[in-house]
Swiss-Prot record:
Family affiliation: Belongs to the universal ribosomal protein uS8 family.
Stretches of the chain forming a coiled coil according to its record: none
GO MF annotation list: rRNA binding; structural constituent of ribosome
Subunit record text: Part of the 30S ribosomal subunit. Contacts proteins S5 and S12.
Annotated Gene Ontology cellular component terms: ribonucleoprotein complex; ribosome
Protein name, UniProt field: Small ribosomal subunit protein uS8
Biological process, per Gene Ontology: translation
Keywords noted in UniProt: Ribonucleoprotein, Ribosomal protein, RNA-binding, rRNA-binding
Annotated function: One of the primary rRNA binding proteins, it binds directly to 16S rRNA central domain where it helps coordinate assembly of the platform of the 30S subunit.
Amino acid sequence: MTSDPIADMLTRVRNAIQARHPKVDVPASKLKAEIARILKEEGYITNFKVAEEGAKKTIKIYLKYANNNSPVISAIERVSRPGCRVYVGQTDIPRVLGGMGINILTTPRGVMTGRDAHKEHLGGEILCRVW
């Protein structure tokens, strides 16, 4: 068992992209499924499915590549860690690459992008950023 399951998920995605794999399997949780949903909505992955294999649930994340086989996700990194949580208010949500990337936050109303949290006047914990 890992001490930071979100970082484990992001590392698996990063490694699969570098190896040019079409999909990657990660152990499932509700929070990871919400992160995958946001990545799909923002166009960073093709699709994801929560699959039950026996007693264990896994999330199959189908990665997205451009026409020249370059990955759509240039970088994906963890911001708030178990040892150093990062919380921001609505006015303090940072921009990623001048608006070209996204922050994924967990707020009192659920997991959403930094842009959506700002529109709804919400702050929260920055889970990761993607560009």
